[in-house]
Amino acid sequence: MPEKMNVLGSRKGFTPALQHNSSVVVADNSGAKEAVIIGIYGYRGVLRRVPFANIADLVMVSVRKGSPDVRKQKFKAVIVRQRMPFRRPDGTWISFEDNAVVIINPDGTPKGTEVRGPIAREAAERWPKIASVATMVI
C-alpha cells in the first residue's frame, strides 16, 4: 500500500464529484462491471455532510453487476475517471464520459490485468501500479 499521505492526498480546491452511493463503472477486467461507492477513505468532513471523493481517491465499493464470484462483495477501489470537470494546475479543464474505478488488492496492486479506457494523469501519478496496466493516460 502506498504511503498514507499518497493514499489520502489533498482535497483542497476540488469540487465534490462522486459521493456516497454514487454508481460507477469498473474499468478493469476483474470480473466486476458496475459498483456503488459505500465509503471514502480519509474523508474528514462535517457531521451529517455527505462525504465526497475525486480523481485518485481511495474508496470502498460494493459490486452490483458482474461475474458471480465478485458480485455482492466489498472491495477497495481507486477513482480513475469522473464526469465532473476538474481543473489542472496549468489551467486546463478535464472531464470524462463516465465515472470509473479500478479495484485494487489490499497491497495496492490492481486486481485485474488491464484497465479499459483512459485514466487521469493524477491517478497515474498517485498509483503507479495502476498506470502500468492502463492502456491510456490523459
Curated annotation (Swiss-Prot):
According to the UniProt entry, its GO molecular function terms are: large ribosomal subunit rRNA binding; structural constituent of ribosome
* Record keywords: Ribonucleoprotein, Ribosomal protein, RNA-binding, rRNA-binding
Q: Per the record's keyword annotation, is Cell inner membrane included, yes or no?
A: no
PROSITE patterns in the record, alphabetically?
RIBOSOMAL_L14
Question: CDD domains from the entry?
Answer: Ribosomal_uL14
Any GO BP annotation: translation
Provide a GO CC annotation, any one. Answer: cytosolic large ribosomal subunit
| SUPFAM superfamilies tied to this protein | Ribosomal protein L14
The cysteines joined by S-S bonds are none
| SMART domains reported in the protein's UniProt record | Ribosomal_L14
Pfam families assigned to the protein according to its UniProt record, in alphabetical order: Ribosomal_L14 (PF00238)
The answer to whether the entry has keyword Cytoplasm is: no
What top-level branch of life does the organism fall under? Archaea
Question: What function is annotated for this protein?
Answer: Binds to 23S rRNA. Forms part of two intersubunit bridges in the 70S ribosome.
Q: Can you tell me which family this protein belongs to? A: Belongs to the universal ribosomal protein uL14 family.
The subunit field of the Swiss-Prot or TrEMBL record says: Part of the 50S ribosomal subunit. Forms a cluster with proteins L3 and L24e, part of which may contact the 16S rRNA in 2 intersubunit bridges.
Question: What name has this protein been given in UniProt?
Answer: Large ribosomal subunit protein uL14
